[in-house]
From Swiss-Prot:
Cofactor note as given: Binds 1 Mn(2+) ion per subunit.
Any one GO CC term of the record: cytoplasm
Gene: rhaA
GO biological process: L-lyxose metabolic process; rhamnose catabolic process
Name assigned to this protein: L-rhamnose isomerase
Source species: Listeria innocua serovar 6a (strain ATCC BAA-680 / CLIP 11262)
Length: 420
């Protein structure tokens, strides 16, 4: 009996078990296939980019490790991404930062244009991918005194305002060329190391600068903007201008998506608990699925409680339609392609786990105060053959099942990465 027959056979058994509790596995698999994950380019080169790859990584973030094989050119990065996507079921998106320009021109962040990203667009067309975007408000000499858009220096603010405006045009270009809405996410690391006297004025400057960046109305068929908060970063421990409250207020009043990064809050605070509230009041959500270990460490996403809870919240509350799921982690201590594959597949698995729940029945039990049945069923579900459904999903989408993907990554490492 071949592996394919065995996987299909095990799936049929699992299908019947789920059917017995009212879950349609075929419907779950169809829904999962339609969910695009926005995989981040910066895992592939440790957030160096191609604008100034030898420059310092600033903005209060840090990539640690020196595992061999990091990409040094756009061509190498695309080659690595192709390998990763070939091991992940479904068709997805790539999330680009502005520093990942692909051009022979000497260009600065306040000069970037769509043409500097044309090779990415042509490649995305060939691969059947969408593209999301991020202006890069860090790793640049104009990141002065820990400030960009909130700087008291008008010259600094104006530089970054221009960068933000140009980023919007690039995101719009992606959407027009690829026929998929490009999400353009604004994260600004501005902050202060020690306790400030004036918390209000920098936030007012940031608000006014963002208003100027977003002044021109763009067609949301092509691009939508998200704004991302953060609690603190290295060198900005006491105060971050773009706090959660700031961007929640800004996003709701300016009709922007609100980006929630799993690592950008207090260590005991989780973004899964925020989704239902934001869904009531905001236009929609951009997720940066990450794994904070004691701080915003951007560890690779594993199948932990919070990832499972994020999947549940999105599915149980029917939020998939207003949520854009992206990843944000960068670990230079392990094979970078493996990092992409593990993180993306785990995010998909968390969604599948949630899609395999009898959600309507569980909600009915809860409404009727039948908490006994609710507990019994949710606990029993933990032992259901979820893995057999996932393996079948991988098989029908033509990607390796189980750990077979690791063999391919190891071979690629030997043949390609270790020769760089």
């Amino acid at each position: 009996m071949g592996q394919e027959t065995e996987i299909s056979k095990r799936y049929q058994v699992a299908k019947e078990r789920y059917q017995a509790i009212g879950v349609d596995t075929e419907k779950a698999l169809k829904t999962l296939k339609d969910i695009k994950i926005s995989m981040h380019c910066w895992q592939g080169d440790d957030v160096k980019g191609f604008l100034n790859p030898d420059g310092e990584l600033t903005g209060g973030i840090m990539a640690t490790g020196n595992y061999p094989g990091a990409a040094h050119t756009p061509k190498q990065l695309r080659q690595d991404l192709e390998k990763a996507y070939s091991l992940i079921p479904g068709k997805h998106k790539l999330n680009l930062h502005a520093i990942y320009v692909d051009t022979d021109e000497k260009v600065d962040l306040n000069e970037i244009e769509p043409k500097h990203f044309t090779p990415w667009v042509e490649w995305a067309k060939e691969q059947g991918l969408g593209l999301d975007f991020n202006p890069t408000f860090f790793s640049h000499p104009m990141f002065k005194d820990n400030y960009t858009l909130a700087s008291p220096d008008k010259e600094v603010r104006d530089f970054w305002i221009e960068h933000g405006k140009r980023s919007r045009k690039i995101s719009e270009y992606f959407g027009k060329e690829l026929g998929q809405t490009s999400i353009n996410n604004f994260w600004v690391p501005d902050g202060i190391k020690d306790c400030p006297i004036d918390r209000y004025t920098p936030r007012k400057r940031l608000m006014e600068a963002l208003d100027e960046v977003f002044a021109e109305k763009l067609d949301e068929k092509y691009t939508q903007e998200a704004v991302e908060s953060k609690l603190f970063g290295l060198g900005a421990e006491a105060y971050t201008v773009g706090s959660h409250e700031f961007y929640m207020g800004y996003g709701i009043t300016r009709d922007k998506l609100i980006c929630l990064d799993a690592g950008h809050f207090h260590p005991t605070e989780v973004i899964s608990n925020k989704l239902s509230s934001l869904a009531l009041f905001s236009k929609g959500v951009m997720l940066h699925v990450s794994r904070p270990v004691r701080w915003d460490s951007d560890h690779v996403v594993i199948m932990d409680d919070e990832l499972i809870e994020i999947g549940r919240e999105l599915v149980r509350n029917d939020l998939l339609g207003i949520t854009n799921i992206g990843l944000d982690f960068f670990d230079a201590t392990i094979n970078r392609i493996a990092a992409w594959v593990v993180g993306t597949r785990n995010t998909q698995k968390s969604l599948l786990k949630a899609l395999l729940e009898p959600t309507a029945d569980l909600k009915k039990m809860e409404l009727e105060n039948d908490f006994t049945s609710r507990m019994a069923i949710t606990e029993e579900l933990k032992d259901f053959p979820f893995g057999d459904v996932w393996n079948y999903f991988c098989e029908i989408n033509g990607v390796p099942v189980g750990l077979d993907w690791l063999k391919e990554v190891k071979a690629y490492e030997k043949d390609v990465l270790l020769k760089r």
